[in-house]
Curated annotation (Swiss-Prot):
Binding site for Mg(2+): 198
Gene name of the record: MT-CO2
The organism of origin for this protein: Boselaphus tragocamelus
GO cellular component, one term: respiratory chain complex IV
Location of Phosphotyrosine modifications: 218
Cofactor: Cu cation
Ranges per topology, Mitochondrial intermembrane: 1-14, 88-227
Record-listed Cu cation A1 binding positions: 161, 196, 200, 207
Compartments it resides in: Mitochondrion inner membrane
Protein known as: Cytochrome c oxidase subunit 2
Amino acid sequence: MAYPMQLGFQDATSPIMEELLHFHDHTLMIVFLISSLVLYIISLMLTTKLTHTSTMDAQEVETIWTILPAIILILIALPSLRILYMMDEINNPSLTVKTMGHQWYWSYEYTDYEDLSFDSYMIPTSELKPGELRLLEVDNRVVLPMEMTIRMLISSEDVLHSWTVPSLGLKTDAIPGRLNQTTLMSTRPGLYYGQCSEICGSNHSFMPIVLELVPLKYFEKWSASML
């Protein structure tokens, strides 16, 4: 859950998000070291008189500044590609949920159940109860079992949308006429909030997403009560 004056990411709730946080720290350290080196060289150039204005060729320096950036790019690319393949891989999902974006609400269909579908609208500010979050609460939450692989099929009925839940590391475009898929697995129960992340019209900011991750036995009770 985000909070005011937050500087970092939300707490990771899925293995993918944990990998993304590790990759962010890895890349940030590389960027910090490169920036420090560049600033150090600039400071030397500004403070020393040992310059070589007549130097026309320096094979050693050119070799270093060609090979070193290539190595750095490889160190960034390899873990990035690994995470991309992990995010794209879906093996034997335990549950499939179809998500459709509309102007300006979401529809959900549990394809493993008959007649288990609903629309999810934002609760207006005037109808919020004490303790509920403005612009983030919905009338129907997406209840899912924790510690299970869940496949989300995402599309749109009208314009471009984007189904995003930051703490799970999810951001998938909802495109009319196209079915995208992503996978999620939560390591702990709780409420996880997201929003549409693609400008889709005047009420774009009023399309919240609320996932309620619960143990399997509670999910079974909920699904039975919805049928």
